[in-house]
Design a protein with these regions (language model features):
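Transition-metal
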Residues: 1-240, 313, 318-331
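A short beta-loop-beta micro-motif enriched in histidine and acidic residues
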Residues: 30-32, 98-99, 109, 148-150, ...
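Short, conserved beta-strand element in jelly-roll/cupin
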Residues: 37-39, 105-109, 116, 151-159, ...
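Ligand-binding loop in jelly-roll beta-barrel domains
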Residues: 106-111, 118-120, 148-152, 158-162, ...
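Short acidic-glycine-tyrosine-enriched beta hairpin
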Residues: 272-282, 287-290, 359, 389-410
């Protein structure tokens, strides 16, 4: 088992305090958006052997170049040395010689871009196409960073606000009807975009209704930006919003962050969700979503393939986006945990690359078997735990994380003797076995 040093991504939307607070360490002073725990080649964790751990004590943060000495090695390089040992034969057969999942701590202070992730076939084909065309992998117009899909899930540690998947067209139409009534009541001229959207959304075929409304908005242009500004001006000056307060206050917030961006009104086509701490949602390919605010544990297939659909100053490839969006109204894909032995919770989304175990250990509690098929990763967000495998022990304090090779299973997670507080940890492994 290897303790890990992980890379912090300082995206501008990140909270400056939430990740440091969760992990019990000093804040960097800048935004701390995502902590990546895994072997994605863009930001691999560093695996520390006992010697490397001593050398690193007191240091922290990201390391671009990792020397292959002193007991420190990038996790992807470690796995490359013996994939079957670290990942297990079954995982290598299913996903190839790479860690199939990525665990993140995500802290959104302001909204992330509206986005969609591709299916496995779309990712493979898109990556091959851009490679063949010689598009630089770091180019702004590059869509596919790797050849893999990126289904994901988010577990809320704090109240967590998000947009997730299309609502039924009739529900979105009702919001635009309310806005039309607000303009009439105030004697304001209705932007022509609104009656056009009402017509789009009235189509009896729900797929067509969502598709035409989405296409009209994502096309952008002055019609969209002027209508957005007029709607926000009406809302700010007190237009009635009931019963769509949450949706319409989100419109105002998004417009302030990204004035006139197509994503501002696209938000009204999507489910507006508020997760309570302990709740989780999963996001399959084709689901249009955006995280708005909150701290969570995010797990995904190890990929960085994102097609953006707005709420971003970054490149938006509309034709490619339209190929990947699923224009179907969906119920919010909430993920209920299975309660396993000793009261532990296991979140199993319908993807084979990952499952998430929430491990709670009160002082003196019985040890908990780690759910593990193939490799696993664990992060301690409260208290301390002792990992006990047939090959040895590893104690992890508050904020520490570790990589657990397949060959070192089974692992039991113990409360640390003498601990006074409850320990809380999150562990990820593949979902190859039932
Ligand atoms: Zn996403």
């Amino acid at each position: 088992m290897y303790e890990l040093e992980n890379v912090l991504r300082p995206y501008a939307w990140g909270s400056t305090t939430a990740i440091a607070g969760l992990l019990g360490r000093p804040a960097s002073g800048g935004p701390e958006a995502e902590l990546w725990i895994g072997a994605h080649p863009d930001s691999p964790s560093v695996a520390l052997s006992p010697a490397g751990k001593r050398a690193a004590s007191g240091s922290g943060g990201a390391h671009a170049a990792v020397p292959d000495d002193g007991g420190r090695l990038a996790l992807d390089e470690l796995i490359d040395r013996d994939p079957e040992h670290y990942l297990g034969a079954e995982s290598v057969a299913a996903f190839g010689p790479r860690l199939p999942f990525l665990l993140k701590v995500l802290a959104a202070e302001s909204p992330l871009s509206l986005q969609v992730h591709p299916t496995p076939d779309q990712a493979r084909a898109g990556f091959a196409r851009e490679e063949a065309a010689g598009v630089d992998r770091s180019a702004t117009e590059r869509n596919y960073k790797d050849a893999f899909h990126k289904p994901e899930m988010i577990f809320a540690l704090t109240p967590f606000e998000a947009l997730c998947g299309f609502r039924p067209a009739a529900e979105s139409r009702a919001v635009f009807q309310l806005l039309a009534a607000d303009f009439a009541l105030a004697g304001l001229e209705l932007p022509p975009l609104v009656p056009q959207l009402l017509e789009d959304l009235a189509q009896p075929d729900g797929h067509n209704a969502l598709r035409t409304a989405f296409e009209r908005l994502i096309a952008g242009g002055t019609d969209v930006s002027e209508a957005t500004a007029a709607i926000v001006a009406a809302l700010v000056s007190g237009a009635p919003t009931a019963p769509y307060q949450a949706e319409l206050s989100t419109v105002v917030t998004l417009h302030h962050a990204y004035p006139g961006d197509p994503g501002v009104l696209i938000s009204l086509l999507l489910n507006r969700i508020s997760l309570a701490p302990g709740e989780a949602v999963y996001l399959p390919a084709g689901n249009v979503h955006a995280y708005l605010h909150g701290l969570g544990i995010e797990v995904m297939a190890s990929s960085d393939n994102v097609l953006r659909g707005g709420l971003t100053p970054k490149f938006v490839d509309v034709p490619e986006l339209l190929k990947t969006v699923e224009f179907e109204a969906v119920a919010v894909p909430m993920l209920s945990p299975e309660t396993t032995m000793l009261g532990q919770e296991l979140f199993r989304p319908p993807f084979r690359e990952f499952q998430l175990q929430r491990i709670v250990l009160a002082p003196g509690a019985e040890p908990v078997p780690l759910a593990q098929s193939g490799a696993a990763a664990i992060l301690v967000v409260s208290g301390s735990v002792l990992l006990d495998s047939p090959k040895g022990d590893l104690q992890l304090g508050h904020g520490a994380s570790a990589f657990l090779p397949a060959a070192e299973a089974p692992v039991n997670v113990h409360a640390v003797s003498g601990a006074t507080g409850t320990a809380l940890a999150f562990a990820v492994t593949t979902a190859l076995k039932d």
